[in-house]
Amino acid sequence: MEDIHEHITVVVPRRGINDEGKAKKHALYCLISAAETEYVWMMDDDVVLEVKGERLELKGADLLILPLRMASENERPSLLERLQIAEYAAIQQLTIESAQRGKAVMCSGANLIVRRSRWLESYQDLHPEIPSGDDMFLLESFKRRGLQIMVLDDSRYEAIVRPHTSWRAFFRQRMRWAGKAPKYTDKDILRCGTIVLGANLLQLICPLVLLVKFPIEYRLIKKREPFVSLWTALLLEILYPFYILLSIVGGLLRRGW
């Protein structure tokens, strides 16, 4: 932990407690309990973040969603990396826009500021028996309790995350995400998930659905990551229904990830 000023403590779970073991949420609890500031800034230990802004004004937020961007360390990203960057751009744009409209459906513990006392009050809502998902379950808990959720879409506070370099690691992460889905109860999250799943299953049955879906999702991608090519986005759109189906089946078969 590191104090960056009198109101915020940075909390970074290290490798070894940030893996798939069930100790992760307990470790977060210990770190956040030990903090003495009003807020904690949660981030992953492998993100790249260089704050370029002035003193951060939290304006009474209980949860502040901060921007993330995926970027490869390679000068010429692989196909897998390019697909992940496009997907992540769409996810991030949806995260930002839904939060701005007061109906947040996603957030990421890779770059998140939370009021310490509120996090501790919500700890039992984080499903400690499930290794991952503390960020999404926290979002659900805060929405259910009517707490103040805000978003700051400012590149000065943007953290950089890296794409997976192997298909195996990529699908393991997506299966973990899918495996948590049955635990979600928030109506906005469920509605969004149902629309995404339904549209992609419909595309498997009728490929012409792509003509409706692609312009919507391409807008999300380009707004967040303008350098993603049309062909990368189109390939992602074609493969996405198969990828979602595989992730869901794998995630449900391996519950408890």
What role is predicted for each listed range?
Residues E38-V48:
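Short beta-strand-to-loop acidic/aromatic patch adjacent to the donor-nucleotide binding site
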Residues M1, E6-V12:
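Hydrophobic targeting segments
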Residues L64-A90, L120, D125-D188:
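Catalytic donor/gating beta->alpha subdomain of glycosyltransferases that bind UDP-sugars
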Residues I17-A35:
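Glycine-rich, basic loop-to-helix element that forms the pyrophosphate-binding segment
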Residues H5, A35-E38, A61, Q124-D125:
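Active-site acidic short loop of glycosyltransferases
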Residues C192-W257:
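Membrane-embedded multi-pass helical conduit in multi-pass membrane proteins
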Residues E36-T37, M106-Y123:
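Conserved nucleotide-sugar donor-binding
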Residues G53-L64:
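Conserved donor-nucleotide/metal-binding helix-loop-beta segment in metal-dependent transferases, i.e.
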